[in-house]
From Swiss-Prot:
Protein name (Swiss-Prot/TrEMBL): N-arachidonyl glycine receptor
This protein's UniProt keywords: Cell membrane, Cytoplasmic vesicle, Disulfide bond, G-protein coupled receptor, Glycoprotein, Membrane, Phosphoprotein, Receptor, Transducer, Transmembrane, Transmembrane helix
Gene source species: Homo sapiens
Phenotype upon changing A108N: Increased cell surface expression
Encoding gene, per UniProt annotation: GPR18
Highest rank taxon of the organism: Eukaryota
Localization, UniProt: Cell membrane; Cytoplasmic vesicle membrane
Length: 331
């Protein structure tokens, strides 16, 4: 099997993955699927159905939860592929999953950039606070990002095929890790610039201005609760970008510029795991932003504690009854 490197020269293509990687992928994706599915369904329901006063942040959060859910729903197919070492779902569905692997981090970073800009407006430009309630602009921004991202990822369905599609059993190498997404340089260079560097610079610019204003006391008119909430959101976004998205894109850039053999790359696999982890870390954002989401999480925790206490009471009462029965029989 061969594929093409950056100079369009044939190089060996090795699709094998270590057994340790497959086991780790199955365990990791299972945890991500269970946690992420519960968290994001709850968040989408809270933001879309139970939130009375919607703001621009809640609009962005609805889109984050929706994107997370779309990506999470692809994980069972990945797990099946790693468990069975074959792909029975066809070439077209493999291409769709490969495109979604590119689609998720691209749109997620822009949504995080929108949230950062929103917090910039809340802290640095409080006189424009009314704009934060203008959900129409937020909806238009989200629709624009969805269209833009779909437009750039759709060509991945058509431009290149799985180099091992005719093998038996069938494979789907594009969903394995990011090394199989580097074949089209122009498209990937655009992706790296427009869907990583630009939103990253927007976030960094917003954070620097916000920190400068906080240090120089130019936010005295801002309510302490609003300031504290905004700082928490900023710290959460910064940690999420640094941990989940930056290693993934740095590794992707090195792989894209490299000319070596296309084979299993442990750093590519590890950074892909980190990128997938962001679907669960969004729960911190949901918890900070929405009081309704906080209430749902607390109610679930209290309900679990209630069930545990009831089980303990029933166990104790059952033990006391059995002791009384034994005593009566002895008498």
């Amino acid at each position: 099997m061969i594929t093409l490197n950056n100079q369009d020269q044939p190089v060996p293509f090795n699709s094998s993955h270590p057994d340790e990687y497959k086991i780790a992928a199955l365990v990791f994706y299972s945890c991500i699927f269970i946690i992420g599915l519960f968290v994001n369904i709850t968040a989408l329901w809270v933001f879309s159905c139970t939130t009375k006063k919607r703001t621009t942040v809640t609009i962005y959060m609805m889109n984050v939860a929706l994107v997370d859910l779309i990506f999470i729903m692809t994980l069972p197919f990945r797990m099946f592929y790693y468990a069975k070492d074959e792909w029975p779902f066809g070439e077209y569905f493999c291409q769709i999953l490969g495109a979604l692997t590119v689609f998720y981090p691209s749109i997620a970073l822009w949504l995080l950039a929108f949230i950062s800009a929103d917090r910039y407006m809340a802290i640095v430009q409080p006189k424009y606070a009314k704009e934060l309630k203008n959900t129409c602009k937020a909806v238009l921004a989200c629709v624009g990002v969805w269209i833009m991202t779909l437009t750039t990822t759709t060509p991945l369905l058509l431009l290149y095929k799985d180099p091992d599609k005719d093998s038996t059993p069938a494979t789907c190498l594009k969903i394995s890790d990011i090394i199989y997404l580097k074949a089209v340089n122009v498209l990937n260079l655009t992706r790296l610039t427009f869907f990583f560097l630009i939103p990253l610079f927007i976030m960094i610019g917003c954070y620097l201005v916000i920190i400068h204003n906080l240090l120089h006391g130019r936010t005295s008119k801002l309510k302490p609760k609003v300031k504290e909430k905004s700082i928490r959101i900023i710290i959460t976004l910064l940690v999420q970008v640094l941990v989940c998205f930056m290693p993934f894109h740095i590794c992707f850039a090195f792989l894209m510029l490299g000319t070596g053999e296309n084979s299993y790359n442990p750093w590519g696999a590890f950074t892909t795991f980190l990128m997938n982890l962001s679907t669960c870390l969004d729960v911190i954002l949901y918890y900070i932003v929405s009081k309704q989401f906080q209430a749902r999480v607390i109610s679930v925790m209290l309900y679990r504690n209630y069930l545990r206490s009831m089980r303990r009471k029933s166990f104790r009462s059952g033990s006391l009854r059995s002791l009384s029965n034994i005593n009566s029989e002895m008498l």
